[in-house]
Regions:
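Conserved alpha-helical positions within TPR/SEL1-like repeat arrays
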Residues: 624-635, 658-669, 692-703, 728-747, ...
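Structural signature of tandem alpha-helical TPR/SEL1-like repeats
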Residues: 606-612, 636-648, 669-682, 692, ...
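Polytopic membrane enzymes that build or remodel cell-surface glycoconjugates and lipids
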Residues: 1-461, 465-475, 479, 485-486, ...
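Short coil loop/turn residues that delineate tetratricopeptide repeat
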Residues: 616-623, 655, 689, 723-724, ...
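Ankyrin-repeat and related helical/solenoid repeat scaffolds used for protein-protein interactions
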Residues: 887, 894-955
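Low-complexity, disordered terminal segments
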Residues: 490-492
Length: 969
């Protein structure tokens, strides 16, 4: 069945190949683009101190999602490819392919043998192509679900390997597995109770056994020991003495591998939890699977099974306790995120939360009604018992309960009733039939007959003894050593734990008692696979910040696909009896698969960019979709469409503060200040903690000339309480912006000391690190404060502030440039200033601002030729900047390079055709170069733009005079 694994993984890759050229959409921006843990602005240990979005877990506004391993993969992507999205999408697709392969392996191990072939194929192909996975794969933030699913399945498979090794170990120590006298000899030599009671012959045999064990381990290697092939021969009943002794060595090795695999399962479960919290449910899933798998086993295995379950439970409880303690106080979410959670009516909450799992199951069953967001009222709350959806809820839970109960009834209760009919062991004296096992009287009896009467250790009950019958032949055996036992062990005392019975061996070979023979047990396992990972998102244990999230269904969909595989395999079990029906059924499965593939490809196109994504959800969640679509259209410059989208969103839901704020930004950019002010005021009314609205409201008031009101609003914005805000970095950035704008207003009104106070307050908000607060850094604010000190002529404080900025950002060219400009104000430190200008130029040689400022400094030093070179370079680096072109032309004219200056004046006039000064300057340089006709035309154009300009009129008269004199001569 390896072809199924490879084919399904290949299908998964082909279906999601078209996501490689997608960009960062929706939640990707906050999780990656503005997350300092991803961009490397924080140390590596901060990954284990912050939540998924980069907010410290100790912060009141933390989301509470702790996924450091997932964030570490983002950081690795950033280190390898920066912010190019293709590498992020490629890793997502790769993780989906590996998850598909693991699902195929899991299906092969869990499905009943009779339906394994078709069931595995249906399970793996359905998982690869299911459209519900598009959000998890196409959205980069879905990597948490992808990585968690991979580690979840690996943990389960490793625990399954632990069960296999445990069974092998139990069978080797248990009853009725081997019949050869060679095994009895090897088994006796491996018993720890004989270490000091062996004869000389036994001691030699033990030495040889240990030596053979080392040879076998070296010959087989660790991989074959772990694989089924390496341990499989240990349970064979036929073989030579060499095989028997090897089985003993492998048994002892399997003990170590057994506990290593259990530790590995717990370790993988912990790693999965560090990718996404619902993956911790792999621990109860393994426990449920172990109980379902072991109910048919003999009592010999119970002790080992409960030991594994206890250890697994201890590890799971420890992880859960650590995670809950790490989370601290539960996060708070907005009412719009999960309206039912904030509903005051208990009945509404109960009915709605009972219905939501059915809606999620509907999305798995019919994944053609998908949305990027299901918040707000995308799914109306159930407020009455008479809502028709309650019938669906009751029907669904009734069917699931009945199916589960029938499976339990037919498997477990029947097994219990059969176990009661087993004959209880009786004291030896009460046995009606006497069985003799004196093999010494029949020395020529064949070995198999002797094995049927082998010794089994009696159970003690008080003072009496009960004989333990052979589990294979059900016959009581002798209390004393059998003839074979005495022969093999030189009449030494043996603490036997097993009898040797060929009947039992044959029974074990013919009727293996495993879970794979029961479709009902498989059904219960798959239901657990689907239900347990969904429990953390069900609102039953605690409220979550969403109504429905499609990427959360990535892990539960494994159980759903396994159920589909079980159903398909069961229906095609007798396919050879009716070939027509089987072909029709397989054809319908193929059509369903093709439909899912088509929907997946189509849905991937929706996730290509934000505009297509938001448009795809207009019919499902109109207020959210229109609001986000308006932001995208506004960023693209499509202002009319953006405004229409914002107003449609507000028509559906008028209390959305984000939409009011974004509409205000749009109106502010159009200089419609009155309308913008109203939008910002509504945003503040619906969300008083929205600091960004205060910032932009203050800016709009200042632009409208209402400076006093602007100062009051900005001061209020700096004092907004940020407790439990969704994005603490954005909130702090808004407060810093308010303080910076407040300082600018104070500077405009010449209130220098108030401006300094605002900058000092901003520095208290910004942390003393290189972590940007969404656009604001500590060194940028220190630089602005230094400029204020320079205006006040407090040179010592100005230099101290500049030095602090350099210490905070030693590789920032703008900080070096600011310090150089500060030094240039002091004529005695011009050489030192020139050194700092050169340092800034070395740090950022392609920055036109650095070259422009350096050129201005050189010009002030009367080094005109060098100044012209720097200013021309600045103009070349900013080819669309008319001011830089004009500055380069002036520097060239001062350096007596008038022909070169002419070209740059022409460039400036082309870049700013409506600027009269540009045309006047062009006329002047043409005048100097002797091109009088062209100079007159430039002067006339300048006078058209600025009639009555005296300088231009004077220059034009001079040109006319020169042209007249030239004509006369």
């Amino acid at each position: 069945m390896r072809w199924v694994t490879w084919a399904s993984s290949l299908l998964a890759f082909l279906l999601y190949y078209n996501t490689m050229d997608a960009g960062f959409v929706y939640d990707d921006r906050r999780a990656i683009l503005t997350n300092p843990d991803v961009t490397g602005h924080t140390p590596a240990e901060a990954l284990f101190q912050n939540d998924f979005w980069g907010t410290p877990l100790a912060d009141d506004g933390s989301h509470g999602s702790y996924r450091p391993l997932c964030v570490a993969t983002y950081r690795l992507n950033y280190a390898l490819s920066g912010l190019r999205p293709w590498s992020y999408h490629f890793l997502n697709v790769l993780l989906h392919c590996t998850a598909t392969a693991l699902v195929a392996i899991t299906a092969k191990k869990l499905l009943p043998r009779a339906c394994s072939r078709v069931g595995t194929a249906v399970t793996a192909l359905t998982f690869a192509a299911h459209p519900i996975h598009t959000e998890a794969v196409a959205a980069i933030v879905g990597r948490a679900d992808l990585a968690a699913c991979n580690l979840f399945l690996l943990s389960f498979l490793v625990y399954n390997e632990h069960l296999r090794l445990r069974d092998i170990s139990g069978k080797m120590k248990g009853n009725c597995l081997y019949r050869s006298d060679d095994f009895v000899r090897a088994r006796s030599l491996s018993t720890g109770d004989q270490n000091f009671r062996l004869s000389c012959h036994g001691l030699v045999q033990q030495i040889f056994s240990n030596f053979r064990k080392l040879l076998k381990a070296g010959k087989m290697g660790p991989l074959r020991l772990i694989s089924g092939d390496g341990l499989g021969y240990a349970v064979k009943t036929e073989g030579s003495s060499k095989g028997s002794e090897s089985s003993v060595s492998v048994s002892e090795d399997s003990e170590l591998l057994k506990w290593l695999s259990l530790s590995g399962a717990l370790g993988l479960a912990g790693a999965a939890t560090l990718c996404k919290e619902p993956a911790i449910t792999v621990v109860p899933l393994c426990i449920v699977y172990d109980l379902l798998r072991g109910y048919r086993q003999n009592t010999v295995h119970h002790k080992n099974r409960w030991r594994s379950i206890c250890l697994l439970s201890t590890g799971g409880v420890t992880m859960l306790y650590w995670r809950l303690r790490l989370a601290g106080a539960p996060p708070t979410f907005a009412t719009a995120d999960n309206p039912a959670a904030r509903d005051p009516a208990l009945l509404t909450r109960a009915l709605t939360f009972a219905y939501l799992p059915i809606f999620n199951f509907y999305l798995l069953l019919f994944p053609f009604h998908l949305s990027f967001d299901w918040s707000m009222d995308a799914i109306p709350r159930i407020t009455s018992l008479f809502d028709p959806r309650n019938i669906v809820t009751a029907t669904f839970y009734t069917i699931v309960s009945k199916v589960a109960w029938r499976a339990i009834k037919h498997e477990f209760l029947r097994e219990l009733s059969e176990s009661k009919e087993i004959k209880v062991y009786k004291p030896r004296g009460s046995c009606k039939t006497k069985y003799k096992s004196n093999i010494s009287r029949h020395p020529h009896r064949n070995l198999e007959s002797a094995d049927r009467r082998a010794y089994h250790a009696p159970h003690r009950d008080g003072g009496g003894k009960k004989l333990c019958p052979c589990t294979g032949c059900r016959h009581p055996v002798s209390e004393d050593h059998s003839g074979i036992c005495r022969t093999m062990n030189n009449n030494n005392y043996m603490n036997h734990q097993s009898c040797i019975c060929a009947v039992a061996v044959k029974a074990k070979q013919i009727k293996p008692q495993t879970v794979y023979n029961s479709s009902r047990v498989a059904l219960l396992t798959f239901l657990a696979f689907m239900a347990l990972p969904f429990v953390p998102a069900s609102n039953f244990l605690f409220y979550v910040g969403f109504v429905v999230a499609e990427r959360v269904l990535y892990l539960p969909s494994v159980g759903f696909c396994l159920l589909l595989g079980l159903g398909a395999g069961t229906m095609t079990k007798g396919w050879h009896r009716n070939e027509l029906k089987s072909r029709m059924f397989l054809g319908s499965l193929l059509l369903c698969l093709l439909a899912m593939c088509g929907q997946t490809i189509k849905r991937n196109m929706d996730w290509r960019d934000e505009e297509s994504l938001f448009k795809s959800a207009l019919h499902i969640n109109p207020p959210k979709a229109y609001g986000n679509l308006g932001s995208v259209l506004s960023a693209q410059g499509r202002t009319a469409e953006a405004e229409a989208a914002f107003r449609r969103a507000l028509a559906h839901r008028p209390n959305m503060a984000d939409v009011h704020y974004n509409l205000g930004i749009l109106l502010q950019n159009q200089r419609r200040y009155e309308a913008a002010i109203k939008s910002f005021e509504r945003a503040i009314y619906f969300r008083p903690s929205m600091a960004l609205a205060y910032v932009n409201l203050g800016a709009a008031l200042a632009s409208d000339g209402r400076l006093s009101e602007a100062v009051s609003v900005l001061r209020a914005g700096t004092r907004v309480d940020g407790t439990r805000v969704r994005d603490r970095r954005e909130h702090d950035s808004a407060r810093v912006s308010a303080l910076v704008q407040l300082a600018a207003l104070h500077v405009q009104r010449s209130h220098w000391h108030k401006a300094l106070a605002a900058y000092r307050e901003a520095l208290q908000i910004i942390p003393e690190s290189e972590v940007p607060i969404v656009g604001w850094t500590r060194h940028s604010v220190l630089t602005m404060a230094g400029e204020i000190y320079a205006q006040l002529r407090h040179w010592a404080q100005a230099e101290r502030s500049a030095r602090q900025a350099l210490a905070a950002a030693p590789r920032d060219a703008a900080t070096h440039l600011a310090y150089a400009k500060l030094l240039a104000r002091n004529a005695s430190r011009s050489l030192e200033a020139e050194e700092w200008f050169k340092k800034a130029l070395n740090l950022d040689p392609n920055n036109p601002e650095v070259r422009d400022q350096f050129g201005q400094f050189l010009r002030s030093q009367q080094r005109l030729s060098e100044a012209a070179e720097q200013l021309v370079a600045a103009a070349q680096l900013a080819p669309s900047n008319a001011a830089r072109a004009a500055a380069a032309a002036r520097a060239l004219r001062d350096a007596q390079r008038c022909r070169s200056a002419e070209r740059w004046y022409e460039r400036a006039a082309v870049l700013s055709p409506e600027d009269a000064q540009s045309h006047s300057n062009l006329g002047a340089i043409l005048h100097l170069n002797g091109k009088y006709a062209a100079a007159a035309a430039a002067y006339r154009r300048a006078l058209q733009l600025l009639p009555g300009d005296e300088i231009t009129l004077t220059n034009l008269k001079r040109v006319y005079t020169l042209m007249t004199n030239q004509h006369r001569t």
